[in-house]
Amino acid sequence: MIMSKETLIKSIREIPDFPIPGILFYDVTTLFKDPWCLQELSNIMFEMYKDKGITKVVGIESRGFIMGPILATRLNAGFIPIRKPGKLPAEVIEESYDKEYGTDTVQIHKDALDENDVVLLHDDLLATGGTMKAACELVKKLKPKKVYVNLSLIHISEPTRRS
């Protein structure tokens, strides 16, 4: 069974007013629970990056931890987490950013990447771009050879708000 990108997107549940009033939340668990959707999403992303020489997939907490390791395995690459403060045990670097409903900080291990790495920075979707921008800044500080940015599902140019 081959699914279109539109079919994958339609399988995502929208939840109004979560986590705060005025935010339309895209719940990707409805896509991930369907084995055919999960496989098709994996296939689409693998085809995009299979010839790029990716050595590390960097996933952003927490939903980047779902497809990130799947994609890393398919690309024969390592997986590196970007996490919220206090979750990584070794020395870290961090970056703070604004998001739709507040301010947050993300961290990565200081020794996670080096100048020989070709990185695929992965998250599930883009809302304001704050998290991805902070993650890009973290990855750039570690000076990898090249960085690709991948979003599994949806690009939202502005925060989606209900009237």
What spans do the regions from the language model cover?
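A short alpha/beta connector and helix-capping loop motif
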Residues: M132-L153
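Short Gly/Thr/Asp-enriched flexible loops that form oxyanion-binding sites at enzyme active sites
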Residues: I66-L75, C136
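Conserved G/P- and acidic residue-centered "switch" motifs that form tight phosphate/ATP-binding loops
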Residues: D124, G129
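Short glycine-rich phosphate-binding loop at a beta-alpha junction
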Residues: I54-E61
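Conserved acidic residues
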Residues: T55, D117, V147
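Active-site-facing substrate-recognition patch
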Residues: I2-I54
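Single conserved hydrophobic/aromatic residue that forms the stacking wall/gate
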Residues: V149, I154-S163
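Short, glycine/charge-rich flexible loops or terminal/linker lids adjacent to PRPP-binding catalytic cores
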Residues: A77-V119
